[in-house]
Amino acid sequence: MKNWKVLITICVLGCTRICAQETGANDTVSRHPLTHGVGIDFRPVYLIPTNEFFAGENAAWQPLRKSVSAHLKYSFRFHPDSRYGKLYPHTYQGIGVSYHSFFDKAEIGTPVAVYAFQGARITRLSSRLSLDYEWNFGASFGWKKYHPGTNAYNYVVGSKINAYINLGFLLNWQLAAGWQLTTGIDLSHFSNGNTQYPNAGVNTVGGRIGLVHLSLIHI
C-alpha cells in the first residue's frame, strides 16, 4: 500500500512543479502569451528479453517481442521575448497520459501511465528541422502482477503500480505554422524499484512518431 502511494506522490509532485512553473510564468511575464500545445504519439517498440518470461517461458510458451503505446500530451513553452523564454529557448514541458499493450493482457495487463515530461532542442539542422530530446517520468497503473497460483510465470512485474521512465531523441519538423511532426527513437523502463518482488522490470527500445499542434493563448 505504501509503495504505490510513494509512486503516486512522486508523479503528482512532478506534475505540480510543471503547473507551478506555468503559474509563475504567468505572474512574471503576463504581457507575453504562452505557447500551448496538444500532441499525440504512437510508439511501436521492441521488448528487450531481459527475463525468460519474454523469451517464451510464459503461459502461451511464445516469445514476447513487441509492444505499442499511444500517448496524448499537453505542453506549454514560454514566449521567446519573455524572461523565461530567453533563459530556456526551445524548451517545453507538460503532462501526458499513455496506453500500453504488450500483447499479453492476461499475464501482464494493459497499463495506463500518467507522467510529466520535458524536452528541448539539442541542435538546429535546418530552418525547419531540429534534433531534440525528451524525457518522461511518472506512474503506470493496471499491471497484472506475479501470483504463485494464478500468474506464476510473470517474474517481471511484482506490483499493480510501477514507475515509468522514458528518454527519447527526436527529429522535429516544422510542417507549417503551428504544426510539428516528430520522429525518433526512445528507451523505456517500468519497475517498482524493488519495493515488491519479483521485480525484473520491463524494458523497451524502439521508434516513435508524433504530431503536435501549437497555439498562442493569452492568459
Region roles according to the model:
Residues H79-D81, T123-R128, Q174-G178:
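Outer-membrane beta-barrel channels and translocator barrels
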Residues G56-A60, F102-K105, N151-V157, N192-N199:
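Extracellular loop and loop/strand-boundary signature of outer-membrane beta-barrel proteins
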Residues F42-I48, F76-F78, V97-F103, F137-K145, ...:
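Transmembrane beta-strands of outer-membrane beta-barrel pores
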Residues H218-I219:
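Conserved small/polar residues in nucleotide/adenosyl-binding loops
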Residues V38-F42, L72, Q93-I95, Y133-F137, ...:
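Membrane-embedded beta-strand positions of outer-membrane beta-barrel proteins
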Residues H32-V38, L87-Q93, S127-Y133, A177-L181, ...:
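Outer-envelope beta-barrel architecture signal
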Residues Q21-R77:
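Short glycine/proline- and aromatic-enriched beta-strand/turn motifs that initiate or cap beta-hairpins
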Residues L34, L64-A70, I108-V114, L129, ...:
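Residues that define the transmembrane beta-barrel architecture of outer-membrane proteins
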